[in-house]
Amino acid sequence: MTQNECFQIAKLALFNVKLLNELENIGHEELKNLIKDVHEKLSIEQQPALINQSTYLQFAYVTLVWLWESINIKDKDDFFIKLKARAHKRELAFPDAHQISGERVISDWKMLVSLLRNALSQGNVEIINEAFIFSDQKKFGKRKEIVPTTLNISATELANISETVFWTINEIIVPTSK
């Protein structure tokens, strides 16, 4: 697949998130009945909201792992400069120090994206209510870590970080984008 084809797949994931959010906000009776029917067919314990933890996790994985690997960003330093600028423009705050624990210092977007990507790709994500705890631990090599480094963020923060990475990737692929 080309970079643009990969990006279009990730764009569909973003479309799904935005569409589900809009549908959930509409709240028509027919839609509620449809959700209830699917819920019962799948035997899910509690009826989920259209936008739920899996929605955010799926979009994060598609963007931060699959799309990232598919397009192979050549100049990562330039990417992270653009990501920081886009985050600032979107008024996306970097996670506070109290949200991060462990041996590793996570002080910039490059380190943050690395932690998220590693945790997502290795399945080291814990979900507690509306929050995600991402864990990453270097167990091999010269910089082996005794304890994992964790990041505790809300679903909204994860969505905003993922979308900011998404649009920054778009800017790399199509330089005249948003």
Protein language model features and the residues they cover:
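Amphipathic alpha-helical interface elements
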Residues: 1-141, 148-178
